[in-house]
Amino acid sequence: MTREPHSHDPSPPKRPLPRSFKELTPANHFNPRTFFYEMVWKAWLTPRNGQHQRPAFPKLKPGDVAITWIGHASFLIQFTDLNVLVDPNFANWLFLLKRLKRSGLKLRDLPPIDLVLLTHAHFDHFHKPTLRKLPAPKIGVMPWGVGDLARGLGFARIIELQKWESFSHADWKVTLTPCKHWGARTLRDAHRGYGGFVLEHQGRKIYHAGDSAYFEGFKEIGRQLAPEIALLPIGAY
């Protein structure tokens, strides 16, 4: 395994943890008790539903792209010569949080994965048990300060990027874009980065927003990178 951190600014500025979700959303009526009831208690009482589907992946021509929403923020992006996973998480439980919809396909039905994009270190997006089980050696691309969490998870290469920094390999390119969120996995690691990605390959540009609230940066991403497809798992939490 080789770990390739960002090549400039070895100490990116830290963003303090938000004091509440009010700092991440225009809503001014956030209530922690309501959030706990809706996201935890109500979920416990709700039967899990949805069905796994055995995928019939299409035959693609150069320039074609197939995108499968697995669930939550997880997507499978396929080209003729490249299989990409974004924020893969196949778990039915995440601590107290219950998954209400089964993942759209089973982990064992995935094709060999060439590239994994991880938008930030939160447990529902950077799910270590899932990452350990992914088929085939792979490249992992993630924001600054997250690479240490990826050690020992089977990645052949680990790439960390700063905002607006790009990494190219073969004939594909990925750029880390800003988002309105935060990156800490615990209360003591606010140095970790966060963002979204624009993936460019075979003339296509695909944008995954990460775990972002709405912000003016969407306009800047559109101006600078002009993605043609946007994957917006906003509100998935």
Predicted regions and their residues:
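Short amphipathic alpha-helix with an adjacent loop that forms part of the alpha/beta core around
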Residues: 104-111, 167-171, 188, 219-224
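Metallo-beta-lactamase
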Residues: 1-94, 98-109, 142-208, 228-235
